Amino acid sequence: MKDKRILSRFGIVILVLLALVLIFPSAKIDLASSIEASTQASVRVEHIQNFARSAEMDVQLLSADDPAYQQIANVLSGLTCVKRFNQQYSSYSHEYPVDSVTVSYYDDTENNNLLFTVYSDGTAIVNSQFVKVKAPKGGAEEVYRELAEIVK
């Protein structure tokens, strides 16, 4: 009887570990392959005064041969983004005012391949999913500074 209990507990532990192994590797988002599959991008730089109003907005359309496109692609391709499972839009708010840079990548048929938004307060969102950003020079705040410098 004792052996069956041990086997049962061991089986449950194995199932939990298997579930974790299946969940966590899929938490990483591959930005580089989405960027490589794209031929154009749009970049939106925003200064947001409060929840209801953007004070300033600048939108640029970039083709793959544009130097700014290449610089942005180099910055984003070097990032590691991991999904945050515990953060939802409804429970998140910024300290206003806040600035943001949003990059949308598209293929030849104008299908959206990637939507990346980073805020000056260090928040990052990829394809409507909050992410933790790891960059060679820091986190999301540093990525925001790099992208804002490229598009200004």
Q: Where are the regions that the model predicts?
A:
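Function-determining sites in protein domains
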Residues: 2-152
